[in-house]
Regions:
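Acidic, carboxylate-rich catalytic segments that either coordinate divalent cations
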Residues: 94-130
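Secondary-structure transition/capping residues
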Residues: 27, 47, 86, 116, ...
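Aromatic-enriched hydrophobic runs in primary sequence
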Residues: 10-16, 36-38, 44, 123-124
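Short, small-residue-biased leader/transition segments that mark boundaries at the very start
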Residues: 1-2
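An amphipathic alpha-helical core segment
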Residues: 32-107
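Acidic/His metal-coordination segments adjacent to aromatic residues that form catalytic metal sites
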Residues: 9-28, 56-59, 86-91
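Long, hydrophobic, amphipathic alpha-helical segments used as structural scaffolds
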Residues: 20, 24, 43-50, 109-116
């Protein structure tokens, strides 16, 4: 059964797609950087007390590898290089795309915690109208 993604998920994905419409790919790359960065940091924090659930621990270990850390460093270096090569307008767009993605990452985790669905969003709107 297909369930529509929650509005937060839709909004985050739409944000990323919009950045790829920009002529400067640095803007799109800046919008992508927060996701692996956050997952890596979160994985390291969660691994301080390993999970007794093997499946969950495997998920954690996916995000704490040296390979992922190296990949993130390379992505960060690329984004920084593209930032240096950009004009002031695009630099501002890169910062905005990065910050919006950081915000959307937080909303994405909140969405999962709250078990948000498109239907629950609509129900919340209906309650606000009353």
């Amino acid at each position: 059964v297909y369930k529509r993604q929650a509005s937060t998920c839709y909004h985050y994905i739409s944000h990323i797609y919009r950045q790829f419409a920009e002529p400067n790919l640095g803007i799109a790359f800046a919008s992508l950087l927060p996701c692996p960065w956050l997952y890596h940091d979160l994985g390291k924090a969660l691994n301080r007390k390993p999970s007794p659930n093997p499946l969950y621990q495997q998920w954690i270990e996916t995000y704490i590898t040296d390979e992922l850390e190296q990949q993130i460093k390379e992505e960060e270096a690329l984004v920084n290089q593209l930032y240096r090569e950009s004009d002031e307008t695009d630099k501002q767009k890169m910062l905005e795309a990065f910050h919006r993605s950081v915000h959307m990452e937080a909303k994405f985790w909140e969405m999962a915690y709250q078990h948000q669905t498109w239907t629950s969003d609509l129900q919340s709107l209906e309650k606000e109208k009353k």
